[in-house]
């Protein structure tokens, strides 16, 4: 189960338990923070009211002085280089599960929700394709799967060796800067291309 916009609280977990829903992925701290310390989850798997919560990975992408910036792992908002680095660091630290968030609409650029004027988002499509190739080439360390299958596998592993660590992974500041620049340039180009596409002949 995943709620819209990652909106969650303790009452939601209790309701999921009453409904017999065994797995949830409700937490993505950089998207929504309920301010409940019990749900300030960055990674891993955690039981709440008997429901196995598998938060979308939240990581620190940069820090300036005492100010740190948190980001939730998505295709649209994270470069392939950043994602690969996070997967490597998660593997090094034995984090049992990494959840990445994406949506179909992120792979097209559009002028409005009518989709009358749209084009493929080559930047996001390339990130996904590169991630898929990377995961396919590293199946000895990473097993791409859906939430239900992941929940079953993690549930069995936790019975053998309970692990509720909540590790905050650190990304790379310079990779974040490069991603921000890349995204800004591509978004501007996409807006220009859409304007040309929608212009009257």
Residue ranges and their predicted role:
Residues 3-95:
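Active-site-adjacent pocket scaffolds in enzyme catalytic domains
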Residues 1, 26, 145-147:
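Residue-level detector of family-conserved "landmark" positions at structurally sensitive sites
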Residues 2-3, 121:
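A generic secondary-structure micro-motif detector
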């Amino acid at each position: 189960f995943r709620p819209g916009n990652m909106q969650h609280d303790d009452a939601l977990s209790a309701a999921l338990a009453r409904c017999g829903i065994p797995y949830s992925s409700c937490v993505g701290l950089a998207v929504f923070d309920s301010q409940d310390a019990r749900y300030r989850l960055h990674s891993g798997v955690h039981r709440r009211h008997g429901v196995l919560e598998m938060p979308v990975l939240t990581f620190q992408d940069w820090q300036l002085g005492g100010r740190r910036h948190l980001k939730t792992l998505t295709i649209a908002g994270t470069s392939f280089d950043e994602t690969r680095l996070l997967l490597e660091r998660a593997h090094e630290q034995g984090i049992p599960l990494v959840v990445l968030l994406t949506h179909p609409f992120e792979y097209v650029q559009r002028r409005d929700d009518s989709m009358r004027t749209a084009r493929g988002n080559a930047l996001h499509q390339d990130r996904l394709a590169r991630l898929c190739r990377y995961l396919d080439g590293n199946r000895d360390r990473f097993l791409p799967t859906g939430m239900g299958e992941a929940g079953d596998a993690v549930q069995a592993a936790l019975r053998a060796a309970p692990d509720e660590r909540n590790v905050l992974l650190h990304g790379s500041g310079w990779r974040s800067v490069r991603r921000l620049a890349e995204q800004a340039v591509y978004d501007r180009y996409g807006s220009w291309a859409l304007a040309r596409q929608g212009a009257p002949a």
